[in-house]
């Protein structure tokens, strides 16, 4: 068991990044539970390069169904089934995404594991744990006695539900993780109630993520030091020393929360 909650950035890149792995974080709670937030197509390689075996992951939380956030789930499912003898880990999925995650994304690659098996379902590969959602504000789900998840609806792209995540360890708010969202003043106000904030960031204004300029202009200077920027493009170095007191989350770096 750890004495502190820790967050390791497995990947920090945008959907089209070639320098960085898909944006993903591994959170170790003080009870020893290892929760991976999102699992895009390059995340299994990112875990491997960090020396983190899939066997050590207790659960995966999905924030939305874009490929750079779920594209690695097929590999995890098949590895657990055929290499680890049918091991099933937790899959924490917002209740609105359980059906589309399987029907629209994973079913094509996982539908027929072998000829003699009945047609599988998502629950044949994972222990599916549905997370409460709300169209407005926050929804709270207790995962274990000392571990809870809060979901905040985000605006990312039309016709897709997506969520930011607040993590609670032993009754203490630990970190706000935006996943993917356009600039949203109300969401940032929620975020700043947490001790630490990991927020997605793009280097131009307009599009489906908050821009660096929007975040700089809205977040008070006294709060910026608690904010780490993630989900950025390959031209990261062009923006060194241009983030105010905010910092870039670094791929492979572990943060004590």
Swiss-Prot record:
Zn(2+) 2 binds at residues 64, 66, 156. SUPFAM superfamilies: Metallo-hydrolase/oxidoreductase. Zn(2+) 1 binds at residues 68-69, 180, 231. GO terms for molecular function: 3'-tRNA processing endoribonuclease activity; metal ion binding. It holds the Pfam family Anti-Pycsar_Apyc1. Keywords: Host-virus interaction, Hydrolase, Inhibition of host innate immune response by virus, Metal-binding, Viral immunoevasion, Zinc. It catalyses: 3',5'-cyclic CMP + H2O = CMP + H(+); 3',5'-cyclic UMP + H2O = UMP + H(+). Its cofactor is Zn(2+). Transmembrane segments: none annotated. One of its GO terms (biological process) is symbiont-mediated suppression of host innate immune response. The keyword Nucleus does not apply. InterPro entries: Anti-Pycsar_Apyc1, Metallo-B-lactamas, RibonucZ/Hydroxyglut_hydro. Coordinates 2 Zn(2+) ions. One protomer coordinates the metal ions and the opposing protomer provides the catalytic residues required for cCMP hydrolysis. Counteracts the host Pycsar antiviral defense system. Phosphodiesterase that enables metal-dependent hydrolysis of host cyclic nucleotide Pycsar defense signals such as cCMP and cUMP. Belongs to the anti-Pycsar protein Apyc1 family. PANTHER family: ZINC PHOSPHODIESTERASE ELAC PROTEIN 1 (PTHR46018:SF2). Homodimer. This is Anti-Pycsar protein Apyc1.
